[in-house]
């Protein structure tokens, strides 16, 4: 079962003012190597990502007050991970959250990264060590992401997560094998702005059973927060590299997330869910393109829709 880890962070978002989020849809070109997939064009990919970072740093227009930047799943070459963090830490404005997927690596490397950033990820190491101790899994591929938060003080905090629900034959990229299943994701409580959010790879919003769907755990955790503090989950950022449209049942269940079909869930009633996908040009060597990529979305509770009005002036 996935563990939700609460983390307090220092982000000075202005209370009552809207926040700016940039979803950077870029293509993923992947090829199979061993039991995993790697980027075909890591240098070209880095040039694309670097150009996005430079736009953010220049801060023209709305980008001068950018609060959240999202890049797709498996977007960043692992060889550029350090450089990515260096740019964010040195050149990004304070109060900025950057969420990006990283090229898959072996479990042992992922474990080493958790150790490297143990100040922010110490709570996640024990579960990974338990998996490693339980069998010969060090070579298992990990699809992972980073949530890099530059706090109001300028301090850079680095949080790492692995995809929590990659089952055999479930998804196009990983139909050949089982990936490592991530054991945690973070529930961020930003202060003093009182803004609560989650960031993860691919929301598992199919109710496989009561215990293994992360959507159920998110709802329960947010409800508990609401009942104890009267706060809820303000935003959920989901990075993807997924074909669209998805199965129609997904729409039914995401509606259930907002309490439209199921029991009332006040902890997520006001949640804004941002699905940041890759662009429409992804290519996977050996896989014929039969789906349409390039669709991101923002989902809110239906009660936020503006009602149709017939007035004299309109």
Where in this protein do the model-derived segments appear?
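Cys-nucleophile CN-hydrolase/nitrilase-fold catalytic domain and related Cys-dependent amidase chemistry
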Residues: 47-161, 242-244, 255-259, 263-267
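Eukaryotic short linear interaction motifs
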Residues: 29-32, 78-79, 106-108, 168, ...
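CN hydrolase (nitrilase-like) catalytic-core segments centered on the catalytic cysteine
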Residues: 89, 93-100, 205-314
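A general structural motif
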Residues: 16-18, 63-66, 95, 194, ...
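Active-site catalytic loop in hydrolytic enzyme cores
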Residues: 2-7, 114-230, 234
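Active-site-proximal beta-strand elements of phosphoester/diester hydrolases
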Residues: 18-40, 158-163, 195-206, 237-239
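Active-site beta-loop-alpha junctions enriched in small/polar residues
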Residues: 103-107, 163-166, 202, 278-279
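N-terminal, active-site-proximal structural segment of metallo-dependent hydrolase catalytic domains
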Residues: 1-69, 73-78
């Amino acid at each position: 079962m996935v563990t939700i880890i609460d983390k307090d962070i220092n982000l000075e978002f202005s209370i009552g003012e809207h926040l700016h989020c940039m979803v950077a849809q870029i293509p993923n070109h992947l090829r199979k190597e061993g039991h995993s997939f790697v980027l075909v064009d890591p240098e070209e990919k880095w040039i694309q990502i670097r150009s996005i970072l430079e736009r953010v740093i220049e801060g023209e227009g709305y980008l001068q007050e950018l609060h959240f930047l999202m890049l797709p799943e498996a977007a960043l070459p692992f060889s550029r991970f350090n450089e990515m963090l260096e740019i964010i830490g040195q050149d990004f404005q304070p109060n900025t959250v950057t969420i990006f997927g990283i090229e898959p690596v072996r479990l042992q490397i992922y474990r080493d990264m958790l150790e490297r950033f143990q100040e922010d990820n110490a709570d996640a190491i024990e579960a990974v060590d338990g998996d490693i101790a339980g069998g010969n899994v060090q070579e298992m591929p990990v699809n992972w992401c980073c949530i890099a938060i530059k706090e109001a003080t300028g301090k850079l905090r680095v949080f790492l997560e692995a995809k929590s629900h990659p089952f055999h034959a479930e998804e196009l990229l990983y139909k050949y094998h089982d990936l490592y299943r991530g054991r945690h994701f973070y529930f961020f409580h930003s202060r003093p702005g009182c803004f609560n959010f989650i960031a993860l790879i691919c929301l598992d919003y199919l109710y496989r059973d009561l215990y293994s769907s992360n959507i159920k755990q998110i709802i329960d955790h947010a409800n508990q927060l609401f009942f104890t503090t009267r706060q809820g989950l303000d935003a959920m950022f989901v990075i993807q590299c997924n074909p669209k449209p998805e199965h129609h049942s997904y729409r039914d269940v995401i509606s259930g997330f907002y309490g439209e079909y199921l029991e009332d869930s006040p902890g997520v009633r006001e949640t804004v869910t941002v699905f940041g996908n890759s662009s429409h040009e992804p290519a996977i060597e050996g896989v014929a393109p039969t789906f349409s990529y390039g669709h991101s979305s923002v989902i809110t509770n239906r009660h936020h829709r503006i009602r149709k009005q017939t007035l004299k002036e309109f």
